């Protein structure tokens, strides 16, 4: 068994993705006068589904921005892995047709990548989205080790434009913690165990 080691130093179980859904509901409820821009990993299809579900509940149109985000959601739709209610998804070119408080933008750039959509919005070079005081930006991810400075730079640029930035309690890890790792070993009972994925100290912690 090759088992993920990324969270091998963290005690307990990894929290359920459902907890993020409750957080989204609270944020949408408390920011009904703002445009919401949510940055997350494009590969986290379940997270994107939760955002879309909450947007639909609150009567907001959803715009997907960022090449990888668009490509993955298109693929997920074709495979039946994501369900988008009719008339919820709109093209970014139609964003101006709706008031700010009726829209949500799901975007790439949660790790502060220079050319990602959110970074271009923050640095005022995005062609379709301009950030202002009526925007609430939600980072639904944690910085990958080494990306902290890049993420902080983007947050600073967003806040300098008057936007509110939320980056706490809007993410749960996709990696197994100690009790999850113990559980999978007890269920599989492998002949050989190979810790993978993580820094050396993470591999040692699992071993």
Regions found by a protein language model. Give the residues of each.
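Acidic/His-rich, metal-assisted hydrolase cores and their charged scaffolds
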Residues: 1-207
């Amino acid at each position: 068994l090759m088992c993920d080691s990324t969270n091998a130093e963290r005690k307990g179980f990894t929290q359920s993705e459902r907890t993020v859904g409750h957080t989204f509901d609270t944020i949408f409820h408390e920011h009904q006068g703002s445009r919401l821009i949510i940055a997350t990993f494009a590969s986290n299809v379940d997270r994107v589904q939760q955002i879309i579900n909450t947007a639909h509940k609150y009567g907001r149109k959803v715009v997907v921005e960022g090449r990888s985000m668009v490509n993955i959601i298109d693929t997920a739709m074709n495979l039946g892995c994501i369900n988008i209610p009719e008339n919820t998804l709109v093209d970014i070119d139609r964003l101006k047709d709706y008031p700010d408080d009726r829209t949500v933008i799901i975007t790439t750039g949660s790790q502060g990548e220079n050319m990602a959509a959110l970074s271009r919005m923050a640095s005022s070079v995005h062609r379709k989205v301009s950030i202002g005081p009526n925007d609430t930006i939600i980072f639904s991810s944690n910085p990958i080790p080494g990306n902290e400075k890049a993420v902080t730079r983007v947050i600073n640029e967003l806040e300098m434009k008057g936007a509110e930035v939320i980056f706490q309690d809007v993410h749960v890890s996709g990696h197994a913690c100690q009790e999850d790792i113990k559980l999978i070993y007890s269920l599989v009972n492998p002949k050989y165990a190979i810790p993978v994925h993580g820094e050396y100290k993470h591999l040692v912690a699992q071993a």
